[in-house]
């Protein structure tokens, strides 16, 4: 706990840096909050809950959460399709953890990404890395107000599931 604020710093305090030349945007200073990658979210539509969702994964959390949300809203996937869809991760920003490094030009894609996509990205100068998984577990509940139901969706990246009642 810090002072009399009641706020525990936990491991997220490591997101701060002490020297401006390491990362000028996240230097520790009075009144500043560390960049946090914790991402539980609740989307509201027409003043009602539309989607409750979260993802694990450190600095890729925000990227994966946005891609999941866009898969549902823009690409009209159902909650399960959106949770299982491939994600692309960029490492252009300073890391929140460890040495706070960044890897300009590095992009991670799932290993089932079509070869022509990887080739095109590499032709643009990106360092493309493929992995079996590009996201931590994604879990979500979609509120179907039209039919009075809730639908759970979860990625197949672990022993995760979405439940609503």
Give, region by region, the residue ranges found by the protein language model:
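Proteins synthesized as precursors that undergo proteolytic processing into mature forms
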Residues: 1-131
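In a subset of proteins, long, contiguous C-terminal domains/tails are tracked
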Residues: 115-165
């Amino acid at each position: 706990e810090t002072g009399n604020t009641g706020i525990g710093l936990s491991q997220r305090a490591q997101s701060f840096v002490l020297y401006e030349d390491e990362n000028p945007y996240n230097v520790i200073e009075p009144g500043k909050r560390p960049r946090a990658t914790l991402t539980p979210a609740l989307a509201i539509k027409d003043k009602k809950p539309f989607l409750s969702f979260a993802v694990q994964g450190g600095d890729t959390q925000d990227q994966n959460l946005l891609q999941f949300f866009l898969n549902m809203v823009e690409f009209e996937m159902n909650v399960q399709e959106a949770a299982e869809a491939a994600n692309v991760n960029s490492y252009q920003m300073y890391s929140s953890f460890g040495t706070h490094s960044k890897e300009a030009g590095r992009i991670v894609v799932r290993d089932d990404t079509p070869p022509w996509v990887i080739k095109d990205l590499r032709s643009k100068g990106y360092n493309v890395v493929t992995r079996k998984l590009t996201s931590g577990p994604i879990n979500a509940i979609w509120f179907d107000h039209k039919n009075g139901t809730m639908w759970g969706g979860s990625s197949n990246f672990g022993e995760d599931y979405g439940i609503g009642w």
